[in-house]
Amino acid sequence: MLHRTLTAFLLFLFASAVAAQPMVSAADPRAAAAGIEMLKKGGTAADAAIAMMLALGVVEPAHSGLGGGGFLIYRDARSGKLTSYDAREAAPAAADARWFFGADGKPMGIRDAIPGGRSVGVPGELRLMEAIHGDHGRLRWKTLFAPATKLARDGWAITPRFHNFLTRMPATGFFDDWAKAYLYRPDGQAKAVGTVVKNPELAAFYGLIARHGPDYFYVGPAARTLVATVNGAPRNPSRMTLGDLASYKVREPAPVCGAYRGYRICGAAPPASGPTIVLMILKQLERFDMAALGRDSPVAWHLFAESSRLAYADRDAWLADPDYVQVPVEGLLAPDYIARRSALIAPDRTMAAIAPGTPAGAPAFRKAEPQPEHGTSSLTAVDRWGNVAQATVTIESVFGSGRSMNGLFLNNQLTDFNLKPEKNGLLTANRVEGGKRPRSSMSPLLVYDPAGRLRLSIGAAGGSTIIAQVAKALVGVIDWKLSAQDAISFGLLYAPGPGGVAEKDTAVAAMLPALAGLGETLNVAPLGLKANAIEWRDGVAIGAADPRSEGVSMGLDGKAVKPAAASLVKDRPSE
């Protein structure tokens, strides 16, 4: 009897330890290592997330950093409470609907609007770190900066993926002098793969923030530097003020939650459009037997594409900053509205035209053309107590605005607004306004199984493909019973509007003839996808990273687990 009791007790302890197994997944192994270092020191998921964000600002400067912002959802294991953090960049108070109009009185094109100072929003990432550290951190603030500061000071090697971005960017005409010297050789060619680059300016800046706190950035000397940098830009100067920086605050709106086949899915609230639109895609598919169709069915992918088109159309029409416009989230997710939208989808044909619907609570706005999005970094962490942080951070386009200060790049987030404020005589929801935050595709999500157990923490990078990446992965996990790794690795059909893209060299692209028979007109092209996740199966935490990226998952042993590119092969078996 005593033996059986002791055995049961030990099994309980083992199961509890496994369930709370510390782990991270991030877009770069050096960032993952920074997160694991914090977990080894007894830090929380919040501590690990901060260390990873700081490290990504060093080794992924094309995508994120203190010059940007993002969204994070946090699960407190003790209370079960979910907190959604909105650290999206904000427009200066002086901004208005004509912010991106040129000297000719006409709206700029996106390529003309990005470079310089006017596209820069008030950064939110550092205030995000401050908020989650105050709410959930255990380690000292300055401890969180140590790994990233060392990376910046001692140097980091240029990776093939990062080098590819450098070769696609012109060394002159976009970057300022510091950036050109940091990333390019004197002859204007990108520094080679494997070159170790050092960023003493950023190392010093991290040191100052570690000592003086975030106010050094928002009300101290760095605030004056930032304002001078964007207002003094030789191209597209801004009208940002010190007051814009001093007044910036992280919001904590209620998470957006919904159900799909008994699973509860929760994520960041608008202006993050991702969780709402992911839920729409899934809910519109719920009347179809996606499990029976399976991942290798052209009909399943056709249905996914059609549901995506409808949801993206509603995104472009209705999603924006809820502090400035009425955003009908409840109406978009209402069962009667979902039923009406889903009824437009047919398994045997493609819709001739795509238009937004009219959900309950919809204001009088017009759908506008979506703005292109490119950058972002995604990360997730779980600590020994079972707390979970899932974040997506960004400076928007690759290298943001091209403007830099203190060794970091400043965002071009304001070009996520609609550059044209009106369409057909009506204002667009996502137009520029002073203090407003632009719509985002970011989709940090937590998923609970029908028994209420945490099943998945997932996010992605890659602009507007983020929504499709995450929705596809959830169909894979929930309907097709794939592991999170296989669901992320499987190919994507990205269809934000008429037509779409079947990802090159994947099973989805191989279905093109059959999809054409259903009326789909698709291109085939590579997609720069970058999802990551941690899933829980039978009480065991398992990390997942995208084989298309340089991302990894990592446990306390410090070993980076990177999926092989072969995981994209079309005949990979299901689990």
Where is each model-derived feature located?
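Bacterial N-terminal signal peptides that target proteins for export
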Residues: 1-9
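N-terminal signal peptide c-region/cleavage motif recognized by signal peptidases
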Residues: 10, 14-17
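Noncatalytic scaffold domains of N-terminal-nucleophile
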Residues: 21-33, 37, 43-46, 50-269, ...
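Active-site rim segments in enzyme catalytic domains, especially the processed small/beta chain
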Residues: 58-65, 69-84, 236-241, 387-450, ...
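Short, small/polar residue-rich loop motifs at catalytic or cofactor-binding pockets
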Residues: 252, 373-376, 440-442
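Glycine-rich phosphate/pyrophosphate-binding beta-alpha loops
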Residues: 266-275, 376-380, 390-402, 459-467
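Internal maturation/activation junctions in enzymes
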Residues: 287-394, 403, 546
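Extended C-terminal subregions enriched in glycine
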Residues: 435-437, 470, 479-526
